[in-house]
Amino acid sequence: GLESRELLSYLTDPSRKEYNKYTKTLKDADLVTVSIGSNDLMHLLNISGNIDEMISDNKEKFVRACRAFGETFPKIIRAIKKVAPDAVIVVGNVYNPCHGLESFQEVYQVADHYICELNQGYENVPDVLVADVFSAFHGSHEKLVNMAIRKDAIDPHPNARGHEIIAEKMLEKIQEEET
């Protein structure tokens, strides 16, 4: 997946090979859904060593990543609006993939803190509807992610039910806007 600065580059830098593909796709869009932000934090994780050390060693990096996202996200929305001025843009904020998973409890609270900080970057950005995926996942008693550790990486992606909930939250946000 992309980090927010990579997506911004794809949308704004004509020298990038992805630029034409992205702008061509967006040009005629009526609705744009965006899922961005989680990889801004995920790239800082190194689960091959001691979790406590990883967290303490990267604390300032997590803070900087959250701040940088808060600066980059509004630019992404402006770039999309520049290409597709009439499109409705819906974004799902970031959920905590460790929620409800017993084996990840030591990371859960720390992750929650930085995810909440990162999610502030979605607030007060004009021209975008924000679906509260974080609360939907946090309030659920269902398993919504395929959380797994493979080699030295974490797979935090939603399972089929998790994708359904994300879609439901985005649809609810669109319907709220229409009424």
What are these regions (language model features)?
Residues G1-R67, E71:
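Conserved SGNH/GDSL esterase-like catalytic core that processes O-acyl groups on lipids
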Residues L7, L41-N46, C98-E102, H138-N146:
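Short acidic/His/Gly/Ser-rich catalytic and metal-binding motifs that mark active-site loops
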Residues F73-I77, N119:
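Generic structural signal for well-ordered alpha-helices
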Residues D30-S35, V88-N93, L129-D132:
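Structural recognition of the beta-strand scaffold that forms the well-ordered cores
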Residues I55-A68, Y108-C116, A153-P156:
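A short acidic, glycine-rich active-site loop
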Residues R150-T179:
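Histidine-centered active-site loop/cap adjacent to the catalytic His
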Residues L8, C66, G70, P74, ...:
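Short, amphipathic alpha-helical "lid/cap" segments that border enzyme active or binding sites
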Residues P97-V133:
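Substrate-gating cap/lid alpha-helix
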